[in-house]
């Protein structure tokens, strides 16, 4: 439960950082970022596995790069659920944001969270 809550907060922080750097992404507040992160995590648990299974041949041919497209789809779904509180202006922006989210989440996970768990 604590790991999940930390993941929600890390994703919310990353969404806020991405909002600051990419003009095509708009998050209205910190609370909206936390709610968007919560919705995104729910979609990642419920919808993302189905998308991965249905697109497995494409994902294999692209050597896993299609997973960024799947992440972009879940980001766009999150934005459509959130309405005006979280907006992404295009699918290309969503792909770019999914790449940034994935890279930074991996860096935070491997560089900060895992070493803290080992102590």
Swiss-Prot record:
* Cellular component GO terms held in the UniProt record: plasma membrane
Q: Could you tell me the membrane topology recorded for this protein?
A: Multi-pass membrane protein
Under the heading InterPro entries, the entry gives: Phage_holin_4_2
Q: Which residues cross the membrane?
A: 27-47, 50-70, 88-108
Which keywords has UniProt assigned to this entry?
Cell membrane, Membrane, Signal, Transmembrane, Transmembrane helix
- Secretion signal, residue range per the UniProt entry: 1-23
User: Where is it chiefly localized?
Assistant: membrane
Subcellular location as annotated: Cell membrane
Q: PANTHER family recorded for this chain?
A: SLR0284 PROTEIN (PTHR37309:SF1)
Q: What is this protein called?
A: Uncharacterized membrane protein YvlD
Q: What's the source species' lineage? A: Bacteria, Bacillati, Bacillota, Bacilli, Bacillales
Q: Which gene is this protein's source?
A: yvlD
């Amino acid at each position: 439960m604590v790991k999940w809550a930390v993941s929600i907060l890390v994703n919310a922080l990353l969404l806020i950082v991405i909002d600051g750097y990419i003009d095509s992404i708009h998050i209205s507040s910190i609370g909206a970022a936390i709610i968007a992160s919560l919705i995104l995590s729910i979609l990642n648990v419920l919808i993302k596995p189905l998308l991965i299974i249905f697109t497995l041949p494409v994902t294999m041919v692209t050597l896993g790069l299609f997973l960024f497209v799947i992440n972009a789809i879940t980001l766009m779904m999150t934005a459509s659920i959130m309405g005006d509180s979280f907006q992404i202006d295009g699918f290309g922006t969503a792909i770019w944001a999914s790449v940034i989210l994935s890279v930074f989440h991996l860096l935070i996970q491997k560089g900060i969270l895992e070493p803290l768990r080992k102590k």
